UniProtKB/Swiss-Prot annotation:
Alphabetized UniProt keyword annotations: Ribonucleoprotein, Ribosomal protein
A Gene Ontology biological process term: translation
Keyword Glycosyltransferase in annotation: no
Organism in which the protein naturally occurs: Alkalilimnicola ehrlichii (strain ATCC BAA-1101 / DSM 17681 / MLHE-1)
Family according to the record: Belongs to the bacterial ribosomal protein bS21 family.
Gene Ontology annotations for the cellular component aspect, listed alphabetically: ribonucleoprotein complex; ribosome
Region (Disordered): 37-71
Cited NCBIfam families: S21p
Protein name: Small ribosomal subunit protein bS21
């Protein structure tokens, strides 16, 4: 859990903004959303494999588009 110490003469809004930023960097919200419901190990593997395929296809399409522009 990120900790933010409020400095002397620092407005609350600024400290809150720093806290939100540190939570975002630590990935607290994404972790909470991920753990909100139980996901079976097989479903987790399927989701990760699908994400890997999607990343791979995206990378391939970028490379093909780059090659088309060169000629």
């Amino acid at each position: 859990m990120p900790i933010v110490k409020v400095r002397e003469n620092e407005p609350f809004e600024v400290a809150l903004r720093r806290f939100k930023r540190s939570c975002e960097k630590a990935g607290v919200l994404s972790e909470i959303r991920r753990r909100e419901h139980y996901e079976k190990p097989t479903q987790e593997r399927k989701r990760k494999a699908a994400a890997a395929v999607k990343r791979h296809m995206k990378r391939l399409s970028r490379e093909q588009a780059r090659r088309r522009r060169l000629y």
